[in-house]
Amino acid sequence: MANNASAEKRILINERNRLQNRFYKSSVRTLTKLYLKDLEVYKISRNPSDKEKAKNRLSLVYSLIDKGSKRNVFHKNTAARKKSKLASQLKIA
């Protein structure tokens, strides 16, 4: 339990930041799964429109990863590694 006002404020700020960080991490995971699912559909169908759909999803994932990195949710190297892995998946497909 907090003993003074500044400690109480820190508790509130930490909770706010925890929820914001959780949003970014969860969103990146969710969009990554959707992107990989789009890639699987493209691998099966070989339809150019499916590849475009996957590329659009990739740009959304990139955007969220970059925003999370900017807000210190992800370390910059972690963000770069995630983006690199996703890009290589597209090249393989």
Swiss-Prot record:
Pfam families: Ribosomal_S20p. SUPFAM superfamilies: Ribosomal protein S20. It comes from the Eukaryota. InterPro entries: Ribosomal_bS20, Ribosomal_bS20_sf. GO terms for molecular function: small ribosomal subunit rRNA binding; structural constituent of ribosome. Keywords: Chloroplast, Plastid, Ribonucleoprotein, Ribosomal protein, RNA-binding, rRNA-binding. One of its GO terms (biological process) is translation. It is found in: Plastid, Chloroplast. Transmembrane segments: none annotated. GO terms for cellular component: chloroplast; small ribosomal subunit. Binds directly to 16S ribosomal RNA. Belongs to the bacterial ribosomal protein bS20 family. This is Small ribosomal subunit protein bS20c. It comes from Trieres chinensis.
